[in-house]
Design a protein with these regions (language model features):
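AAA+ P-loop NTPase catalytic core and its hallmark functional loops
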Residues: 1-170, 174-180
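The conserved phosphate-sensing helix
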Residues: 182-195
């Protein structure tokens, strides 16, 4: 967890990529929102050829295949969705609907990313869910690291000669760092946009 734009999701995606390559398993990504349901995310009944059938969501597929899944924007969901992860996060790591039970493969991993509690629009994490997690706080990178990240974003986005003076880029980053707040959580994405 950490402030918006601190690099949590990209770090998690890189971690997932490395894990998937090392274990030869799939990597998944899902971004939570209030509109999602247990059926769309985990496991549930869906209409198929006029009948209700039990179908896996992305989380159940990942559990069965022993993959790693990044669940991004966890605090932009609703508490009821987060609580549905409790049985998956338990030692038994199981989910069920009706008579279908899915036990997680031994290589299954799940990583949640979320903004910290100061971010407006966050849903409060249910205590029973939060107690099942190990959390790491990601703050904004140093000014020098932010400069290097902006350089990389500009190089990848422009695909042309970068004509913006280094001194101007450093000024933009310092200004961004000076005005950054919970109300205005400016990040390297904003600085790169200013440079572009």
């Amino acid at each position: 967890m950490g402030p918006s734009g601190s690099g949590k999701s990209i770090i998690a995606m890189n971690l997932a990529r490395q894990y998937a390559l090392a274990k030869n398993v799939p990597a998944y990504y899902v971004q939570l929102s209030p509109e999602q349901t247990k059926t769309s995310l985990i496991l549930g009944l869906r209409l198929e050829n006029g009948s209700l059938a039990v179908k896996n969501g992305v989380v159940a597929d990942c559990m069965e295949r022993g993959g790693i899944i990044i669940v991004d924007e966890a605090t932009h969901s609703v508490q009821e969705i987060l609580l549905m992860f409790n049985s998956i996060l338990d030692r038994t790591s199981v989910t069920a609907i009706g008579d279908k039970m899915i036990y997680a493969h031994k290589d299954f991993r799940i990583v949640f990313c979320s903004n910290d509690s100061r971010y407006s629009g966050n849903v409060k994490l249910p205590q029973s869910f939060a107690q099942r997690l190990v959390s790491f706080y990601f703050d904004y990178p140093t000014a020098e690291d932010e400069f290097l990240i902006v350089e990389q974003i500009v190089a990848e986005e422009c695909r042309a000669n970068d004509v913006v003076p280094v001194s101007l880029k450093r000024y933009i980053i310092e200004l961004m760092r000076e005005v950054r707040s919970n109300t205005y959580p400016l990040s390297v994405r904003n600085a790169a946009t200013a440079v572009l």
